[in-house]
């Protein structure tokens, strides 16, 4: 019984902490439109033009690999 009460109190405390910090973080994200595109390009490495590429991997930043296996 004691353990159940402690678990309930801890869960309520952690929930309250999350709600308090969620209020502080509202409207702090800048450049919202850029987030999805820059996040993808920063999280994956891509090859710049004239670097060696592989057509079946799509590893060029432009997603275009020519027949000489160079990024366009």
Swiss-Prot record:
Site entry: Inserts into the pore of the channel and blocks the flow of potassium ions: 52
UniProt GO molecular function: ion channel inhibitor activity; potassium channel regulator activity; toxin activity
Tissue distribution: Expressed by the venom duct.
Modification type 4-hydroxyproline: residues: 49
Compartment annotation: Secreted
Annotated keywords: Disulfide bond, Hydroxylation, Ion channel impairing toxin, Knottin, Neurotoxin, Pharmaceutical, Potassium channel impairing toxin, Secreted, Signal, Toxin, Voltage-gated potassium channel impairing toxin
GO CC annotation: extracellular region
Listed result of changing residue 54 to Y: 11-fold decrease of toxicity
Disulfide bond positions: 46-61, 53-65, 60-71
Post-translational modifications reported in the UniProt record: This toxin is not amidated at the C-terminal Val residue.
Substitution effect: residue 49 to A: Loss of toxicity
Signal sequence range: 1-22
Family classification: Belongs to the conotoxin O1 superfamily.
Protein name: Kappa-conotoxin PVIIA
């Amino acid at each position: 019984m004691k353990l159940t009460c402690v678990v309930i109190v801890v869960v309520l405390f952690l929930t309250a902490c999350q709600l308090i910090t969620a209020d502080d973080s509202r409207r702090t994200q800048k450049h919202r439109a850029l987030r999805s595109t820059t996040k993808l390009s920063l999280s994956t490495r891509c090859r710049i033009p004239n670097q060696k590429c592989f057509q079946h991997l799509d590893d060029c930043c432009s997603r275009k690999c020519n027949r000489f296996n160079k990024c366009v």
